[in-house]
Amino acid sequence: MKAQELREKSVEELNTELLNLLREQFNLRMQAASGQLQQTHLSKQVRRNIARVKTLLTEKAGA
């Protein structure tokens, strides 16, 4: 997900996106723990997307 796409979203949409990403991260962690995760790069992508969303929420809160 690109930062520019996220910047166009409202705070409510960003909070929803963050919740979805956290759920996805949990599911990926469970798959990795049980040995079912084939695409290990997805956990890194999700972690970075979470950081992007949190950064934008902080920016919007300060503005």
Curated annotation (Swiss-Prot):
SUPFAM superfamilies: Ribosomal protein L29 (L29p) (SSF46561). GO terms for molecular function: structural constituent of ribosome. Keywords: Ribonucleoprotein, Ribosomal protein. GO terms for biological process: translation. GO terms for cellular component: cytosolic large ribosomal subunit. Transmembrane segments: none annotated. InterPro entries: Ribosomal_protein_uL29, Ribosomal_uL29, Ribosomal_uL29_sf. NCBIfam families: L29. Belongs to the universal ribosomal protein uL29 family. This is Large ribosomal subunit protein uL29.
